[in-house]
Amino acid sequence: MACRGGAGNGHRASATLSRVSPGSLYTCRTRTHNICMVSDFFYPNMGGVESHIYQLSQCLIERGHKVIIVTHAYGNRKGIRYLTSGLKVYYLPLKVMYNQSTATTLFHSLPLLRYIFVRERVTIIHSHSSFSAMAHDALFHAKTMGLQTVFTDHSLFGFADVSSVLTNKLLTVSLCDTNHIICVSYTSKENTVLRAALNPEIVSVIPNAVDPTDFTPDPFRRHDSITIVVVSRLVYRKGIDLLSGIIPELCQKYPDLNFIIGGEGPKRIILEEVRERYQLHDRVRLLGALEHKDVRNVLVQGHIFLNTSLTEAFCMAIVEAASCGLQVVSTRVGGIPEVLPENLIILCEPSVKSLCEGLEKAIFQLKSGTLPAPENIHNIVKTFYTWRNVAERTEKVYDRVSVEAVLPMDKRLDRLISHCGPVTGYIFALLAVFNFLFLIFLRWMTPDSIIDVAIDATGPRGAWTNNYSHSKRGGENNEISETR
């Protein structure tokens, strides 16, 4: 985990000192926020978005903010759950439509989300992922309720196919009156600005990060053979078709070469067919779905990490692999060239031929001993991306949007009509009016004043925060007494 420390005890109007590292570094802050992270993608589902939300939330809690997470139910995981440091997660009973994204009618989620926002006294809604219907719903409802909104885009999209056109139009509607947008790379920022026709000044670039203490090299790694590791969802976008062409070609050329593939998805059948056709059962291991805690143990079994993605805004997997001391070979797509310096990554075109050449280059460097030592790679990578830095930069975005005005209904309707086109604009302006009327009806049925306010688990007045601070002070007093 990236952040395990306790949060400060400050109040909204006064400056607080929050410890953000084991050393003597302290950060002065003038305000705290009540933040609600919303996305369809969260634990127990595994992926980059899920990890980003969890790690960012933990570091924001450490910095003194109140953070809750809203997602949909996963199996029997329903209701309210508490994670490390008092992080409260609402698992809502909403129907999943496709690929862990909920079905939406826009209005059905308003009663639940409104109740949570009021009960938790939320001031900022932070939605994640263009693929999440719940994230778009939360943005729409938050603006109706007069709350500040932030959106983080984790993906890249094209402009030609039907699905991209529809998603881009939805993104245009969702983001036209959102206070601020965060992208994970400069390539992603350019893509999002073009897709949603945004003002670049309200779009910030804050990359993902990795906890270096969770991804360390194995000093006892075997060198009697060469192992290429792939950890990815086995879907088309991750280039699994390319991987199916690479495996037989390199296995035929290098008898001491093995593959370890972690991940699950509809393209697994292709890899199983390749393994069966070329009789590579003892050289190609398919591990299936991995829990995040097991990823490091898989990575350190290899020498080279292969990423075959066809599109990627920011690939956390290559940072994790480099932190474990592996040589990274990756496709040159999206924001990947921004992630690691040239001496730590071999970039290739998204083709079987180019990737095979890149892997052969890495194999030659490995056999000749010209690759940097895994410990040296780890020491370099651990200084690049840290969750505390991500949290500090995100906090500045929150500070900025907290003083911005939320558009009143009349100006919001004008913005929708002028920004989204004559057809889409009028349709969503009408939906915004219906949503506002539905909100008035809900407030008449159950006024905000009679909704019970939840006891804060995190934040300046959080029960978890105060208990942690009290026990910490008690421990320090005991240490002083013992030294006397």
Curated annotation (Swiss-Prot):
It catalyses: a 1,2-diacyl-sn-glycero-3-phospho-(1D-myo-inositol) + UDP-N-acetyl-alpha-D-glucosamine = a 6-(N-acetyl-alpha-D-glucosaminyl)-1-(1,2-diacyl-sn-glycero-3-phospho)-1D-myo-inositol + UDP + H(+). It is found in: Endoplasmic reticulum membrane. Glycans are attached at N467. Signal peptide: none annotated. Residues 443-484 are lumenal. It is a single-pass membrane protein. GO terms for molecular function: phosphatidylinositol N-acetylglucosaminyltransferase activity; UDP-glycosyltransferase activity. It is an enzyme of class 2 (transferase). Keywords: Disease variant, Endoplasmic reticulum, Epilepsy, Glycoprotein, Glycosyltransferase, GPI-anchor biosynthesis, Intellectual disability, Lipid metabolism, Membrane, Phosphoprotein, Transferase, Transmembrane, Transmembrane helix. Residues 1-421 are cytoplasmic. Coiled coil: none annotated. GO terms for cellular component: endoplasmic reticulum membrane; glycosylphosphatidylinositol-N-acetylglucosaminyltransferase (GPI-GnT) complex; membrane. Catalytic subunit of the glycosylphosphatidylinositol-N-acetylglucosaminyltransferase (GPI-GnT) complex that catalyzes the transfer of N-acetylglucosamine from UDP-N-acetylglucosamine to phosphatidylinositol and participates in the first step of GPI biosynthesis. Component of the glycosylphosphatidylinositol-N-acetylglucosaminyltransferase (GPI-GnT) complex composed at least by PIGA, PIGC, PIGH, PIGP, PIGQ, PIGY and DPM2. Interacts with PIGC, PIGH, PIGP, PIGQ and DPM2. Interacts directly with PIGY; this interaction regulates glycosylphosphatidylinositol-N-acetylglucosaminyltransferase activity. Interacts with PIGQ. This is Phosphatidylinositol N-acetylglucosaminyltransferase subunit A.
